[in-house]
């Protein structure tokens, strides 16, 4: 393979050169390049807000670039829509999947281009062509199944198969493993490598460094809307990539934890929730100033614990004591009044109001407290508290009236956490808080957790990333099939021990 810096134009399948894009008051892209070869897997990396999404929207015609050129298979192009891009051989598998849940798998595969026999859809041909593609990609899904019955990983396979059916030459994958098990990730990687072997150029977007090194051949790094480098991945270290992404050296991935947890703040005994299957006889305690991790495989019911504590799920048996006093949270409002806060797993669907501004998203959990004596909202206090969230959480935004949906994932998450801090919680529960967030934003969230622990807050974090749990927590509660398999001291345990416990009740 030719060296990237001296490669000839014929070596490239896709060339995006000197791309500029500005919005009012913001230079989103400044002379950015992305060049992808056939038969390669190309990592596109950068912090949230670095310009990755804007660059790809320029490729797909969602945004019109201000200047620069896009050459695909030797021809300069300017797609008017993602549909046109797909028809020409450029496809994207989004983090938020784009499937019609109540239709069959094969309906989704051929939506808008059904094979016909006379005036009718040729169901037999549609089935056979779908099955042939699935067989070639080693996808074990019945084309006649409803999409709603499938797992997230199976839905992603359908999106990839759809790109395959269009004979896509460029396939862009945005955080494709964020909700997958290790087994599902390995299967996905097998399919990606098959696409590579057919001559596709894969653009792979992920914040998971281990995946990048395992899968990719080359890397392009963006920072603050500017192109930093495009080079072979071979020979680069994780620290070098992080340094280029954030513009500084991160000497450590996790902040130092020097404080010692204090007295017990929360006691949970024999907790069982109503919905089945769910948690059974869960017992643990949480200390002031402690960060308690919850680990477990997919289906272990980790989320059920925090949802039951927060009043989203109803408990059947068991006791919850706060400062030694029995409490029952029958609703989220009751939980908030008792000093609980929950940052949910699905940021876009249950965490933010995507089409509303930062101010609304910052204040919604505490909105009743902003009424003055006349029953009207106190706009001065609301503006002040929104600004506190922006400043304290270091949210990158033009202002408090900015639509939160336009922010990067990391900045959205900071707003959500800031929203809950305004309720002055004693117990902060975070469910996969760094999923889909870049390394710089992750470190800021870890710092925040550490600072809150120093202020005697009790913190519970659910995470599927083992290095994260081992790096930030004091103890780890391991769940297996709805039951507590063990509680371990983080400093005394290993990843293998946690995985052994997580498999105990399967």
From Swiss-Prot:
The keyword Translocase applies. It is an enzyme of class 7 (translocase). GO terms for molecular function: ATP binding; ATP hydrolysis activity. The keyword S-adenosyl-L-methionine does not apply. It catalyses: D-galactose(out) + ATP + H2O = D-galactose(in) + ADP + phosphate + H(+); methyl beta-D-galactoside(out) + ATP + H2O = methyl beta-D-galactoside(in) + ADP + phosphate + H(+). Belongs to the ABC transporter superfamily. Galactose/methyl galactoside importer (TC 3.A.1.2.3) family. The complex is composed of one ATP-binding protein (MglA), two transmembrane proteins (MglC) and a solute-binding protein (MglB). This is Galactose/methyl galactoside import ATP-binding protein MglA. It comes from Yersinia pestis. The gene is mglA.
